[in-house]
Amino acid sequence: MKKKILIAAVLAFLAVLTLVSCSKDKPAESGDLGDSVMVQIEMQNGGIIKLELYPKAAPITVENFVNLVNEGFYDGLIFHRVIKDFMIQGGDPEGTGMGGSDTKIKGEFKQNGWDNPISHVRGVISMARSRSMDSASSQFFICHGDATYLDGQYAAFGKVTEGMDVVDEIASVPTDKNDRPVED
C-alpha cells in the first residue's frame, strides 16, 4: 500500500503538464534560427521546463504550439508516453496517444520538403505525428536522449533551455508495457 501511494505521489508530482506562459524573447544563439519564442511548462509540483522555440526553423509548428498554449489547450495534460533515454511525450487531451487538437498542420521536415536544421538531440522538442506527414496537431515530445535518426522525419521546433532535470525525473517514472506511466 505504501509503495502504491509513493508511486502515485511521485507520478502526480511529475506527470501533470501545465503550460502557463509564452512570450517573445531575444534572438536565438544560433543566428540561423531567428527570433525565438519562450514557453514555460510548469509541473503540478512546481518544477519548470523552459523551452526556446524557433519560428524560422518551423514557423507553422511554432505558431500552432503557441496558439494551443495561449488557448489553454495543454493545461492539466500529462506526459502519456515515457521512454527513458529516448523521449517524453505529451499534448494528448485523452492521455492515450490517440487524441489531439482539431487542427492538423504541415510537417516541417526534410521528407516533407521543408529544410529544418534542428537535430533531434537531448532536450529538443518536436511534434509527434501518425504515419501521415501532415498529421501533427498537439502532441509533442522532448528528447531525453539523442535521437538523430528522427532528423528529417519529424518537425523539431525548439529546445529545453532550463529544466532538463525535470525531464530526467519524468523519464525515470515507472511505465507499463505501452510506455505509459503506471499512475497518472
Short names for language-model regions:
Residues M1-I5:
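Positively charged n-region of N-terminal signal peptides that target proteins for export
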Residues L6-D184:
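Cyclophilin-like peptidyl-prolyl cis-trans isomerases
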